[in-house]
Curated annotation (Swiss-Prot):
<dbReference type="GO" id="GO:2000280">
    <property type="term" value="P:regulation of root development"/>
</dbReference>
<keyword id="KW-0010">Activator</keyword>
<comment type="function">
    <text>Regulatory peptide encoded by the primary transcript (pri-miR165a) of the microRNA miR165a that enhances the accumulation of its corresponding mature miRNA. Acts as a transcriptional activator of its corresponding pri-miRNA. Addition of synthetic miPEP165a increases the abundance of miR165a, with consequent increase of root length.</text>
</comment>
<keyword id="KW-0805">Transcription regulation</keyword>
<dbReference type="GO" id="GO:1902895">
    <property type="term" value="P:positive regulation of miRNA transcription"/>
</dbReference>
<protein>
    <recommendedName>
        <fullName>Peptide encoded by miPEP165a</fullName>
    </recommendedName>
</protein>
<keyword id="KW-0804">Transcription</keyword>
């Protein structure tokens, strides 16, 4: 549950860095 949210945030953050 919380892991999914964390993964989603990580993907968004990674895209922002790129």
């Amino acid at each position: 549950m919380r892991v999914k949210l964390f993964q989603l945030r990580g993907m968004l953050s990674g895209s922002r860095i790129l």
